[in-house]
């Protein structure tokens, strides 16, 4: 038996974020669609060749997306909401961009599709919309075109398709309610057509992704897999692909499916190799994900060699692969020229992970474990590194008591003290934190970072931008202000730069959604705060106005989830280390006179384990970390938190347990649907439902905002409602920001007047 290796997908954006730059240039009207298409072709060709050169046997095709792979699947199926359809019924690249962004260089602007997290990652997908009686047909042949590209270049390819059951699972019903699972029989003919086209191209294996199988699915959804895959049998072999967690709970169903292979994530899953050997049919190809696609740490290949021996001994066909798509990993470690060599030796980015697969498959095929020893040596040396361990942090963690996570009084007492202190009007208006990161701001930070600007001139420049943000907000009539975060490159990276235990890359970019990329810090050791982080800028901003200015912190769970974490200690331990560091920041902000402090936790739900049976333990420590961070605040200090793209109904107990005085949430894309959870739960504290979508450049009208607020007021008492955008305004321009906020403030003022009348 020859063991092949493969990846489940590769980063799309390019080492220098070429795709992002080409997208944004096209959207701004500065380049043509053909120029954008050329960049895409060049990136795909480069990435295929890089994987091949690294020793990957089978190259993924179909992992590239112009915005998001779920959105690509929607277009493939002809699933385009009426508001985005072209008059002639055609589907083109601008159709895709209108769905993702709400507008494109051609076609009429309309509300963008809802966006939410891809399982428990920091990647976002565009939620498919389903209506009763919907028709599907093959209207977007991107996958087939890209397979033709790769074949023309002489590559051995493995097309990648998002599976039909997972696709339906990820979507939402619009209009009259119905069971979207009933649409399965309608989308399967399109899948059959695509598979038939691939068979014509002599494709042997198709990777069909069904990550929903890593969930604890309702019985009717689990039962849907058998008829679905009965219908998809054909000339091509199907590699049913799962990832992000174990599938043991669904393995009996999976093993009865008419497929020829199965991919299992052994990194994040708890599936025992003995269970796989006994349950997965002997004649199936078994592919095991052994290289972590979601982190940056070098794999212990020597350990994997030993762990895989029972499979090598018993399986007729075995592949090794990445645990999931390498989409979630930076591209190339070799360009990181500023990393300390010891620390650098601990890491592997996407290209290095491809090399790891080649090394391990070669060692397995040649029964040569000695060939892996040099690769695994830095992993063992890291265990004893002084960069990793800080005794003082461990002592402080051990001294935590339950009282440390409790505010002095309950919300009703605190609310009274806060009303007396701030004297805010009904329908108080605020923003979520950041203001537009202009070319000038980015240039200022870059010049300072690269040594072209000294600290004094940098701070003077940042102070001017903060002053401008305060002036703009006062002119607009906002009630609670923010300093605008001009000094911050990223809400997680900024804090990581000021905390011990973090390191940073130069080019470690990963895609979050569309053209949005983030450069997560890496947590390499125990976390502590050497000095105050945000206090001076918050204090300066507050000195410019009589209105309250919020202190802005990123919460411990979000910093954890949006960083590449250590793997040698628990996530709970890391979160509580961060919480203790930020607790000191809350205390220092209070001492500086900051009376409203926002602790953002947009990633709280994202951190949930995929198995609902594991939620309780996670939520307990995640909530405790937030409270540990916030509970040092006095009664008249108002603690806000903000959450993104969340379904709240099944975690409302935990949301309430955070005990934040005000929670702001993203609701505009869901037309305030998310507030139903708060209404049914009778959420006791204050809520700011987002009234417009900041991810779209479309400016909401006063009437639009009023309508959403009135809809919110049907569910939440007006005395507990705040008025705010969905999220921070970092990615928007000042012109649209002014227009949108002016309309938002006017809507709040109109409602105040109506309330008095």
UniProtKB/Swiss-Prot annotation:
The keyword Heme does not apply. This is 5-methyltetrahydropteroyltriglutamate--homocysteine methyltransferase. Keywords: Amino-acid biosynthesis, Metal-binding, Methionine biosynthesis, Methyltransferase, Repeat, Transferase, Zinc. One of its GO terms (biological process) is methylation. The gene is metE. L-methionine binds at residues 432-434, 485, 600. 5-methyltetrahydropteroyltri-L-glutamate binds at residues 17-20, 117, 516-517, 562, 606. Zn(2+) binds at residues 642, 644, 666, 727. The active site is at 695 (proton donor). Pfam families: Meth_synt_1, Meth_synt_2. L-homocysteine binds at residues 432-434, 485, 600. It is an enzyme of class 2 (transferase). The lineage of its organism: Bacteria, Pseudomonadati, Pseudomonadota, Gammaproteobacteria, Enterobacterales. InterPro entries: Cbl-indep_Met_Synth_N (IPR013215), Cobalamin-indep_Met_synthase (IPR006276), Met_Synth_C/arc (IPR002629), UROD/MetE-like_sf (IPR038071). Belongs to the vitamin-B12 independent methionine synthase family. Binds 1 zinc ion per subunit. Its cofactor is Zn(2+). Pathway: Amino-acid biosynthesis; L-methionine biosynthesis via de novo pathway; L-methionine from L-homocysteine (MetE route): step 1/1. One of its GO terms (molecular function) is 5-methyltetrahydropteroyltriglutamate-homocysteine S-methyltransferase activity. It comes from Erwinia tasmaniensis (strain DSM 17950 / CFBP 7177 / CIP 109463 / NCPPB 4357 / Et1/99). Its EC number is 2.1.1.14.
């Amino acid at each position: 038996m020859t063991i092949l290796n493969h990846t489940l997908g590769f980063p799309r954006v390019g080492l220098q974020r070429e795709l992002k730059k080409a997208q944004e240039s096209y959207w701004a009207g500065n380049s043509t669609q053909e120029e954008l298409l050329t960049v895409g072709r060049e990136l795909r060709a480069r990435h295929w060749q890089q994987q091949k050169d690294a020793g990957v046997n089978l190259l993924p095709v179909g992992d590239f997306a112009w915005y998001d792979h779920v959105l690509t699947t929607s277009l493939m199926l002809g699933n385009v909401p009426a508001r985005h359809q072209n008059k002639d019924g055609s589907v083109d690249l601008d159709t895709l961009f209108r769905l993702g962004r709400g507008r494109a260089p051609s076609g009429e602007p309309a509300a963008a599709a809802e966006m939410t997290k891809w399982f428990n990652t920091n990647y976002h997908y565009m939620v498919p919309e389903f209506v009763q009686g919907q028709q599907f047909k093959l209207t977007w042949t991107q996958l087939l075109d890209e397979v033709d590209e790769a074949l023309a270049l002489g590559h051995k390819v493995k097309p990648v398709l998002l599976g039909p059951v997972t696709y339906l699972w990820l979507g939402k019903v619009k209009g009259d309610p119905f069971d979207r699972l009933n649409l399965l029989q309608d989308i399967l003919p399109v899948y059959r057509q695509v598979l038939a086209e691939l068979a014509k191209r002599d494709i042997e294996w198709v990777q069909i992704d069904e990550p929903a199988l890593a969930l604890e699915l309702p019985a009717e959804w689990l039962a849907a897999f058998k008829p679905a895959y009965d219908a998809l049998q054909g000339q091509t072999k199907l590699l049913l692909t799962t990832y992000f967690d174990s599938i043991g709970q669904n393995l009996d169903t999976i093993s009865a499916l008419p497929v020829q292979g199965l991919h299992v994530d052994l990194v994040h899953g708890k599936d025992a190799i003995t269970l796989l050997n006994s349950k997965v049919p002997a004649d199936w190809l078994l592919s095991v994900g052994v290289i972590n696609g979601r982190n940056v740490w070098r794999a212990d290949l020597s350990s994997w060699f030993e762990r895989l021996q029972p499979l090598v001994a018993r399986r007729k066909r075995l592949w090794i692969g990445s645990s999931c798509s390498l989409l979630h990993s930076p591209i190339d470690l070799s360009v990181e020229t500023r990393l300390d060599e010891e620390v650098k030796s601990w890491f592997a980015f996407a290209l290095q992970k491809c090399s790891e697969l080649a090394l391990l498959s070669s060692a397995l095929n040649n029964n040569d474990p000695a060939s892996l020893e040099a690769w695994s040596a830095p992993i063992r040396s890291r265990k004893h590194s002084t960069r990793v361990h800080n005794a003082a942090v461990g002592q402080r963690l051990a001294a935590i008591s339950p009282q440390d996570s409790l505010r002095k009084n309950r919300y009703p007492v605190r609310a009274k003290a806060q009303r007396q202190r701030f004297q805010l009007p009904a329908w108080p208006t605020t923003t979520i934190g950041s203001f537009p990161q202009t070319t000038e701001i980015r240039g200022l930070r870059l010049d300072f970072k690269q040594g072209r600007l000294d600290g004094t001139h940098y701070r003077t420049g940042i102070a001017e931008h903060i002053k401008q943000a305060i002036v703009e907000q006062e002119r607009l009539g906002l009630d609670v202000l923010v300093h605008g975060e001009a000094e911050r490159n990223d809400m997680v990276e900024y804090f990581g730069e000021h905390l011990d235990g973090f390191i940073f890359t130069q080019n470690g970019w990963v895609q979050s959604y569309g053209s949005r990329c983030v450069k997560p810090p890496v947590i390499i050791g125990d976390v502590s705060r050497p000095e105050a982080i945000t206090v001076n800028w918050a204090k300066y901003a507050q000195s410019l106005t009589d209105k309250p200015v919020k202190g802005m912190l990123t919460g411990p769970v979000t910093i954890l989830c949006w960083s590449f974490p250590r793997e040698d200690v628990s996530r709970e331990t890391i979160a509580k280390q961060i919480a203790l560091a930020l607790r000191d920041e809350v205390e220092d902000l209070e001492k500086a006179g900051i009376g409203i402090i926002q602790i953002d936790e947009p990633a709280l739900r994202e951190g949930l384990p995929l198995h609902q049976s594991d939620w309780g333990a996670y939520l307990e420590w995640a909530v405790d970390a937030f409270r540990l961070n916030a509970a040092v605040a006095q009664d008249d200090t108002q603690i806000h938190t903000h959450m993104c793209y969340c379904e709240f109904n099944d975690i409302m107990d935990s949301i309430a347990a955070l005990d934040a005085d005000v929670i702001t949430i993203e609701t505009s894309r869901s037309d305030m649907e998310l507030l139903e959870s708060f209404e049914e739960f009778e959420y006791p504290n204050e809520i700011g439902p987002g009234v417009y979508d900041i991810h779209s450049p479309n400016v909401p009208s006063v009437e639009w905002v009023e309508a959403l607020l009135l809809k919110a007021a049907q569910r939440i008492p007006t005395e507990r409602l705040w008025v705010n955008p969905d999220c921070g305004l970092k990615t928007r321009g000042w012109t649209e920001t002014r227009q949108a906020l002016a309309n938002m403030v006017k809507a709040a003022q109109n409602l105040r007047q109506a309330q008095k009348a």
